[in-house]
Regions:
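C-terminal peripheral helix-coil segments that are non-catalytic and often amphipathic
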Residues: 1-14, 98, 102-106, 143, ...
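Membrane-interface starts of transmembrane alpha-helices
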Residues: 163, 167-171
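Short amphipathic alpha-helical segment with a characteristic S/N-K-E followed by hydrophobic residues
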Residues: 27, 42, 65-70, 80, ...
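Amphipathic, non-transmembrane alpha-helical scaffold segments
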Residues: 20, 28, 74, 134-146, ...
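Basic, helix-initiating cap at the start of DNA-binding domains
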Residues: 1-38, 42-54, 61-68
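A conserved beta-strand->loop->alpha-helix hinge within the catalytic CA
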Residues: 47, 94-99, 166, 198
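Short secondary-structure transition hinges
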Residues: 83, 109-151, 193-196
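Amphipathic alpha-helical linker/stalk segments
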Residues: 71-103, 109-111, 115, 119, ...
C-alpha cells in the first residue's frame, strides 16, 4: 500500500490555523538559535526559514528584513521580561532590600540561565556594526532596565532604608556583574575552561555585598527570599 502525504486541501482547517498561529514563534526560536550559534551577520535569512520549516518567502511575510527579525527576537525574549519586571517592582509591598534581591534572582531565572541570555552576548559582540540595532537595544532594553533598577534604589533611599548614593552609578554597579555572568556562560564556560563557579551563588554574594553597601544602619536586615506573585513567564524564557 502506498502512503501519500496529505495535501494542504486535505489538512483540517483548524490544524492549518494552529500551525499558522504558531509560525511566528517558530521563526523567532529558529532565529534566536542561529543568531547565537553563528552570529547575526553570518546567519542568512534562508537558514532561519529552513530551520523553522518554511520558505524564505514565508519568513518575509512575517519579518521583512533580518534586522526586523532580530528586533522581534529581542522583544519576545528580553523586552517582555523587563515589562513584567516593572509590574513586579510597582506592585511589591516588601522592603526595598527584599525587592532588589528578588529582582536580581529573577533576572537570572528569566534571562541569565535561559537561551535568551545569548542575545546579550550577541549585542556585545556585534552591535557596533549595526547602529540601528544598537539604538533599538538602548531604547527598548538598556534604558528601561536601568530605570527599573534605579526605581528600586531610589525607593530605598526615599524610605530611609538605603544611603543617599549616586543612583545612576549604583545601577551600573548592580548590572555589570550580571553581564559578566552571561559573557562567561557564552565564552569560557562554554569551552569548559577557566574558573568554575555557580552563577546563582555569585548572585547571592552580589546581593549580600550590595545590600551591606546600600543599607543604612537602621535599614540593615537580611534580604529574605521574597514571595511576591510574579507574572507568568513568557514563552521567550524556554530553557
Amino acid at each position: 500500500m502506498t502512503l501519500r502525504a496529505s495535501s494542504p486541501a486535505t489538512v483540517p482547517a483548524a490544524l492549518r490555523q494552529r500551525r499558522k498561529e504558531a509560525r511566528p514563534k517558530e521563526l523567532l526560536d529558529a532565529a534566536l538559535d542561529l543568531f547565537v550559534e553563528k552570529g547575526f551577520a553570518a546567519t542568512r535569512s534562508e537558514e532561519v526559514a529552513s530551520r523553522a520549516g518554511v520558505s524564505k518567502g514565508t519568513l518575509y511575510l512575517y519579518y521583512p528584513s533580518k534586522e526586523e527579525l532580530l528586533k522581534e527576537v529581542i522583544r519576545h525574549n528580553v523586552v517582555n521580561q523587563i515589562s513584567e519586571g516593572m509590574e513586579i517592582v510597582r506592585a511589591f509591598e516588601g522592603t526595598s532590600s527584599e525587592l532588589l534581591a528578588y529582582v536580581l534572582r529573577l533576572w537570572w531565572e528569566r534571562v541569565g540561565e535561559t537561551r535568551a541570555s545569548g542575545i546579550l552576548k550577541l549585542m556585545m559582540s556585534e552591535v557596533r556594526n549595526f547602529p540601528e540595532i544598537a539604538q533599538f537595544w538602548v531604547a527598548e532594553v538598556t534604558s528601561p532596565a536601568d530605570r527599573m533598577i534605579a526605581e528600586i534604589v531610589q525607593r530605598g533611599i526615599d524610605s530611609g532604608e538605603f544611603r543617599p548614593v549616586d543612583v545612576e552609578n549604583a545601577v551600573h554597579a548592580l548590572v555589570a556583574p550580571l553581564l559578566f555572568l552571561v559573557m562567561n556562560k557564552h565564552s569560557l564556560d562554554a569551552c569548559h575552561v577557566g574558573a568554575k563557579f555557580e552563577p546563582k551563588a555569585v548572585i547571592e554574594a552580589q546581593i549580600d555585598l550590595v545590600l551591606h553597601g546600600l543599607q543604612t544602619a537602621a535599614g540593615a536586615a537580611p534580604a529574605r527570599p521574597a514571595k511576591a506573585r510574579a507574572p507568568r513567564k513568557s514563552n521567550g524564557g524556554r530553557r
